[in-house]
Amino acid sequence: MTYLTRILETKAEEVAELKKQDPERRYHEACGDLPATRDFRSAITSLDGGINLIAEVKKASPSRGVLVEDFRPLDIAERYAEIGASAFSVLTDRQYFQGSPDYLKAITQKFSIPVLRKEFIIDESQIYETRLMGADAALLIVAALEPSQLRDYLQLFAELGLHALVETHDERELDTALEQGSTIVGVNNRDLKTFTVDLMTSVRLRQRMPDGIVSVAESGMKHRDDIQMMQEAGFDAVLIGEGLLVSEELRQFSWG
């Protein structure tokens, strides 16, 4: 069983429980009274040839285990804001990444920087939940969804004022993302089936993206040269979690 398959099975169980606790109708009604979201798309769009940082607040991963023993999400976010992060990515998955919706809520309340919910979304109820948490954007993984689901979820995101970072890993997934109307497209250098990393995945797929797409390279970048490679490939932003924890080079990079 692959990492992704295992995670999605767990998500199906979580969604079933979520629907018992708070039906979608109540979620929908509650979302109508919320303030406007912050503009995630504009925050990460490169206007002058620079590259923006989506800094991930991350405690653990399935492949590496716990990355930060004394995990203080607000302190981590503060450091990332100081080095020039354009947006935050916050893990809310509990079982595999030891994340929490509470981390996301705390960060959205303290900072004016847009916040992306990093989660494995497989059901509309999670999208309403995302809006109620205070997130400005969320991840949609092409490998976890049918094309028709992706199209419908993108429409719901727009209705709720959310932006979607649509994650791809190969040419087929990129084509699906574009065909279904994605405007912010990420390329994950990490294969979610095996968790192996190849930075050339981003470089290769970026060449296939048309003008007007906001592009994000994700995972595996740990050195200044890695960021420069993504910048030269034409990416608007990079999403980095573990690399910021281990690399002084990345913390001192000139972001934006």
From Swiss-Prot:
What is any one GO biological process for this UniProt entry? L-tryptophan biosynthetic process
According to the UniProt entry, its GO molecular function terms are: indole-3-glycerol-phosphate synthase activity; phosphoribosylanthranilate isomerase activity
Which SUPFAM superfamilies does this one have?
Ribulose-phoshate binding barrel
Per UniProt, which keywords does this protein have?
Amino-acid biosynthesis, Aromatic amino acid biosynthesis, Decarboxylase, Lyase, Tryptophan biosynthesis
Q: Does the keyword Amino-acid biosynthesis apply?
A: yes
Q: Which reaction does it catalyse?
A: 1-(2-carboxyphenylamino)-1-deoxy-D-ribulose 5-phosphate + H(+) = (1S,2R)-1-C-(indol-3-yl)glycerol 3-phosphate + CO2 + H2O
**Pathway(s) of this molecule:** Amino-acid biosynthesis; L-tryptophan biosynthesis; L-tryptophan from chorismate: step 4/5
Look at the named UniProt entry and state the broad enzyme category this protein falls under. lyase
Entry's EC annotation: 4.1.1.48
Against Pfam families, the record matches this protein to:
IGPS
Q: Which CDD domains match?
A: IGPS
Q: Which family does it belong to?
A: Belongs to the TrpC family.
Report the protein name in the record. Indole-3-glycerol phosphate synthase
